[in-house]
Amino acid sequence: PIRIGNVEVPNRICHVPTDISSSHVDGAVSERDIRHHENLARGGTGLIVVGATSPDGKTGRSTVTNLVIDNDYYIPGFARMAAAMHRYGAKCAVQLQHPGRQAALPREGKLTSNDQAVSLPWSQSHAIVYANADEAKKTVHVLSTDEDIALVDLFSEAAWRVQQAGFDAVELHAAHGYLISQFMS
């Protein structure tokens, strides 16, 4: 066993966060999400980090299949997933991520199964994002102080929901040119 803060992980095997692209179109946890993470726990993984979960389903998804936890509607699905992992003794966390300027921003703030890959002209290292073709020419802007504060609140509320769902920890995704990494220099 190993301790991380006040969480005792049964072993040093950790499943790092990945987007398995199986949530419902609205970002809700699917049965496939639950089975996938349950199987990792059944196989003996000590710590499982559920990846690519957005605190902002309207503007903070990079694909149509990202998980979302921006309101209480999502808590029961996440609770079922946490319980499935805990049943086998695993500890579990949720990776909160917002793609920032790389977000898929389709019309009317809703992703659909008709979304497709488009180029990101402002990023050589991140060539595609899944979004409606109409968004290929979207513009980005510097966030205002009010927008910054609103995003901090969204992350805080999402972390609270993760805790309410029974997860043991939260990971903040600060890599790959996503929102949090855009503040690092």
What do these predicted ranges mean?
Residues 52-53, 95-98, 167-177:
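Short, well-ordered beta-to-alpha junction loops that form the rim of enzyme active sites
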Residues 3, 134-137, 178:
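A generic, residue-level signal for flexible/boundary positions that often mark functional hotspots
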Residues 36-37, 155, 167, 178, ...:
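Aromatic side chains
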Residues 1-99, 106-108, 140, 151, ...:
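N-terminal capping/small domains of soluble enzymes
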Residues 57-60, 104-105, 130, 178-183:
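Short acidic/His/Gly/Ser-rich catalytic and metal-binding motifs that mark active-site loops
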Residues 142-143, 171-185:
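Polysaccharide-binding and catalytic clefts of secreted carbohydrate-active enzymes
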Residues 83-86, 97-167:
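Non-globular sequence segments
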